[in-house]
């Protein structure tokens, strides 16, 4: 199959990629054996339309790094960014403690321009539902925040939490993992954020996911696979299955 963009007249747009891209373990499968680290992002972005950056959880890159990311990727590429642990694990969404970190995060991400995609706030498993805290935190977010929330404690899976997210225009992240019960696939915003974290997906699994995502009614859908060597192929296959039900923004390699 050629690298041309493929699309469909349906309203949804599916963006599929991996959690990270700079893995030497991908050499010989996704990357050429002799690829240099500085060439990986360009290679990746020629084949997939989005990437989830996780190391921002530990440290926010300098603006010069963000500028280089933007320059190394084609028009239409999107970076999903995991929010700093200072916000989610240290401040634990307490607005008065997290305010400066939230402002710093979004100020820096503006460097990416239109290539900035969603911002993922991944909460620790020990943090239980606290609706007043969540509501106050949501008021901190800037306009056009594009925020997704991954709750890893089941107490958060409740209608009043979904209502708070809807009111703020934030999305409930669906995360499929081996070690927990995933949340329901509840649309709380016009766009969806899905993390598929199982080690193995069959073609049938991916086809079922494409159908399920199309049925959710989102205008845009971001999907990220775990950072295994199989992740790029899973993302490409999901986009191929999505052609029949969603407009695919991306490039499919031969």
Regions found by a protein language model. Name each.
Residues 1-254:
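Residues lining hydrophobic/aromatic ligand-binding pockets adjacent to catalytic sites
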């Amino acid at each position: 199959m050629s690298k041309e963009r493929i699309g469909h007249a349906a309203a949804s747009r599916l963006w599929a990629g991996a959690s990270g891209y700079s893995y030497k373990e991908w050499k010989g499968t996704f990357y050429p054996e002799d690829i240099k680290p500085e060439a990986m992002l360009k290679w990746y972005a020629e084949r997939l339309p989005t990437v989830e950056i996780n190391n921002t959880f530990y440290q926010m890159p300098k603006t010069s790094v963000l500028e280089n990311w933007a320059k190394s990727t084609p028009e239409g590429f999107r970076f999903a960014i995991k929010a700093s642990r200072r916000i989610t694990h240290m401040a634990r969404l307490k607005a008065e403690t997290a305010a400066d970190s939230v402002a710093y995060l979004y100020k820096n991400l503006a460097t990416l321009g239109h290539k900035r995609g969603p911002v993922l706030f991944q909460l620790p498993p020990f943090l239980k539902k606290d609706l007043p805290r969540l509501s106050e935190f949501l008021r901190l977010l800037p306009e056009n925040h594009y925020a997704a929330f991954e709750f890893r404690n089941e107490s958060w899976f409740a209608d009043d939490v979904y209502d708070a997210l809807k009111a703020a225009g934030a999305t409930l992240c669906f995360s499929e993992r081996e070690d927990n019960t995933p949340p329901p696939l509840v649309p709380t915003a016009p766009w969806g954020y899905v993390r598929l974290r199982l080690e193995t997906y069959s073609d049938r699994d991916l086809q079922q996911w494409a159908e399920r995502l199309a049925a959710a009614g989102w205008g845009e859908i971001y999907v990220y696979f775990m950072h295994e060597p199989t992740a790029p192929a899973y993302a490409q296959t999901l986009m191929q299955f999505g052609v029949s039900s969603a407009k695919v923004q991306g490039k499919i390699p031969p």
